[in-house]
Amino acid sequence: MAKNSMKAREAKRTKLVAQFAEKRTALKAIISDVNTSEDDRWDAVLKLQALPRDSSPVRQRNRCNITGRPHGFLRKFGMSRIKVREAAMRGEIPGLKKASW
């Protein structure tokens, strides 16, 4: 079980990413545009660097909704492999059953 502070930190990162997404994409478009002058490009780079570090999407980590576990995360279910297995064994996930061959 992850600490509550880790879960809260991830929630904060998710909120920051959503808050600064438009500004970040606009600045990146200016930086990657070949017709932009060097001064404008440099200003955009400085503004991008001034944004909060946690507003970058690559700093986010997928975590289990139940336990907060960062490893073994299954995107389709939003849970770790352990909790998916437990829920499947209890029949809580429709259409999911244990494989047998």
From Swiss-Prot:
One of its GO terms (molecular function) is rRNA binding. InterPro entries: Ribosomal_uS14, Ribosomal_uS14_bac/plastid, Ribosomal_uS14_CS. One of its GO terms (biological process) is translation. NCBIfam families: PRK08881.1. PANTHER family: 30S RIBOSOMAL PROTEIN S14, SMALL RIBOSOMAL SUBUNIT PROTEIN US14M. Binds 16S rRNA, required for the assembly of 30S particles and may also be responsible for determining the conformation of the 16S rRNA at the A site. Belongs to the universal ribosomal protein uS14 family. This is Small ribosomal subunit protein uS14. The lineage of its organism: Bacteria, Pseudomonadati, Pseudomonadota, Gammaproteobacteria, Alteromonadales.
